[in-house]
Curated annotation (Swiss-Prot):
Originating species: Chlorobium phaeovibrioides (strain DSM 265 / 1930)
Matching NCBIfam families: PRK05309.1 (NF003698), uS11_bact (TIGR03632)
SUPFAM superfamilies according to UniProt: Translational machinery components
GO CC annotations, alphabetized: ribonucleoprotein complex; ribosome
Pfam families: Ribosomal_S11
Protein name per UniProt: Small ribosomal subunit protein uS11
Assigned keywords, A-Z: Ribonucleoprotein, Ribosomal protein, RNA-binding, rRNA-binding
The protein's assembly and partners: Part of the 30S ribosomal subunit. Interacts with proteins S7 and S18. Binds to IF-3.
UniProt-listed GO biological process terms: translation
Length: 127
């Protein structure tokens, strides 16, 4: 059976976009979208080879952010608004990595959901 090679679809995007960073206690997910909300590129710490507790480190966050930003930069994105959600480590490292690739960060907005005394939180760890 012959294998068919699939060509990646290269689409030019508008220079403006948004970066959504979800930093949980266990992982980091970075999604770059255009103004309409269509995904341009995405990356996560697990996708970049980090496993276990190494996924939630500032270095993993930096590598993940660079991977997603390079792909978006190559497609033509230049200016982004950053939306951060979650309490995880490496939130600042992800933003610095975006600037290092060449994306101009216009605004940074923290959209972490905070309960108005909703669900009971998980019990404290005893290590």
């Amino acid at each position: 059976m012959a294998t068919t090679s699939r060509k990646k679809k290269k689409v030019k995007v508008t220079p403006e976009g948004a970066v959504h960073i979800k930093a949980s206690f266990n992982n980091i997910m970075i999604t770059i979208t255009d103004v309409q909300g269509n995904t341009v590129s995405w990356s996560s710490a697990g996708k970049n080879g980090f496993r276990g507790s190494k996924k939630n480190t500032p270095y993993a966050s930096q590598v993940t952010s660079e991977a997603a930003a390079k792909e978006a930069y190559d497609l033509g994105m230049r200016h982004v608004d950053v939306f951060i959600k979650g309490p995880g480590a490496g939130r600042d490292a992800a933003i610095r990595a975006l600037q290092g690739v060449g994306l101009e960060v216009r605004t940074i907005k923290d959209i972490t959901p905070l309960p108005h005394n909703g669900c009971r939180p998980p019990k404290r760890r005893r290590v």
